[in-house]
């Protein structure tokens, strides 16, 4: 159930703030060229050079004697009008078995390996390294204004300096600049050392994997060590996760399946833009990828205590604007729209219908709306107070113009928009929601 732009998964209202980090791929890579029109409205970064977001990499370690690993790199190009995307081949690595597909349709895309000099000739890549080779991908369509082009790049690297054996121990030692990653060990290996905080999971085929979201600046200093003493074959296959909820009091917890889901690969993110606190209002947008064949709608349940207005929806892959309908849960059932989940009959729901997905297709949606929530967002004396539980792995809150942060109960990184507004980013790598209690005061010049 999607409730009030929060990913609800039976977490209750646990007050646990996980590790947090800057949404660097959108904020640091994209160099904004224009500030918002004014006020405290939505802001979308723009760039004249190549920019990307939502990066996630899966490293599948092959037999250690090969010094090779298979990379699946999910990335979203965001530069409006871009027809190509360039992916560097890391120095010291020998690339082979490359392929690229369009994430929306699942269809292959044309690509070629070019030199850094060739890449630099493209206005998208003025800073391309002449000594580096690049995979140049021809996009299925130019990136729409404020839209996206989602890609999946697959390749095999051979790199003895990154992946080697130390006696009987397998070592994967590789700084990773992408913020969300998974490393899958070869069959029969168990992890005995991981240098960054990570989820330990078992893949459906029995292989052990480590998955993490990087919570610091710069590359993650990842070192994974593993030894070959784990089960293989049917003995290694994971038991199906249970549906019984956690017994932990005082709240009913999430199911085992929800708690063990890979956080780093979850691609639901949200940005709140606080209006002046006297209004109790905040605009927001949240992005969501639908992957289930036959689904022909998205339902967002308005959280109790909030009033939603001005809803809109866009297919980021194409820039197409979708019609938005507001209805009750009972009316949703009567409409026949398949949103893939049940909704309480009395619930107030924002529904976005779309063409049913075919097998192998995916759809990336951006939903924008304005909420009024006096309990969550208010003015207490001279202090702005934003008190709201946020359930996505990647959350951000932008203060209204003229305000500065005085308290943030949950750790956050701070950055500044071109118009001076302060943005706080909360990356939550734990399965519980992060309870954001944020306070701010007016800047001197804003009086």
Where are these regions (language model features)?
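Bacterial N-terminal signal peptides that target proteins for export
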Residues: 4-20
């Amino acid at each position: 159930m999607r409730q009030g732009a929060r990913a609800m998964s039976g977490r209750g209202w646990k007050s646990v703030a996980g590790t947090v980090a800057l949404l660097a791929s959108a904020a640091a890579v994209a160099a904004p060229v224009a500030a918002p029109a004014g006020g405290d409205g939505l802001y979308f970064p723009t760039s004249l050079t190549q920019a990307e977001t939502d990066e996630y990499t899966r490293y599948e370690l092959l037999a250690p004697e090969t010094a090779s690993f298979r990379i699946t790199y999910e990335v979203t190009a965001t530069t409006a009008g871009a027809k190509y995307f360039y992916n560097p081949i890391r120095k010291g690595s020998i690339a082979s078995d490359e392929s690229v597909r369009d994430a929306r349709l699942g269809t292959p895309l044309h690509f070629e390996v070019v030199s850094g000099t060739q890449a630099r000739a493209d206005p998208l890549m003025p800073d391309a390294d002449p000594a580096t080779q690049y995979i140049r991908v021809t996009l299925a369509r130019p990136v729409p204004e404020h839209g996206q082009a989602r890609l999946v790049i697959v390749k095999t690297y051979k790199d003895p300096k990154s992946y080697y054996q130390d006696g009987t121990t397998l070592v994967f030692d590789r700084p990773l600049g992408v913020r969300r990653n998974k490393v899958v060990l070869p069959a029969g290996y168990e992890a005995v050392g991981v240098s960054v905080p990570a989820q330990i999971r078992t893949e459906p085929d029995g292989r052990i994997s480590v998955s993490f979201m990087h919570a610091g600046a710069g590359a993650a200093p990842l070192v994974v060590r593993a030894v070959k003493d784990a089960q293989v074959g049917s003995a290694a296959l994971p038991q199906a996760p249970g549906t019984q909820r956690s017994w932990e009091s005082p709240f009913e917890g999430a199911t085992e399946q929800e708690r063990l889901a890979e956080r780093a690969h979850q691609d639901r993110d949200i940005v709140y833009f606080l209006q002046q606190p006297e209004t109790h209002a905040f605009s927001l947008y949240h992005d969501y990828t639908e992957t289930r064949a036959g689904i022909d709608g998205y339902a967002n349940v308005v959280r109790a205590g909030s009033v939603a207005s001005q809803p809109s929806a866009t297919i980021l892959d194409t820039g197409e604007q979708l019609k938005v309908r507001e209805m009750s849960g009972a009316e949703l059932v009567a409409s026949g729209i398949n949103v893939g989940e049940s909704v309480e009959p009395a619930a107030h729901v924002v529904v976005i219908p779309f063409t049913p997905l075919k097998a192998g297709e995916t759809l990336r949606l951006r939903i924008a709306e304005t909420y009024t929530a006096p309990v969550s967002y208010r003015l207490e004396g001279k202090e702005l107070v934003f008190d709201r539980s946020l359930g996505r792995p990647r959350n951000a809150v932008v203060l209204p113009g003229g305000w500065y942060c005085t308290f943030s109960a949950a750790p956050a990184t701070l950055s500044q928009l071109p118009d001076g507004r302060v943005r706080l980013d909360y990356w939550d790598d734990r399965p519980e929601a992060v309870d954001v209690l944020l306070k701010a005061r007016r800047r001197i010049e804003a009086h």
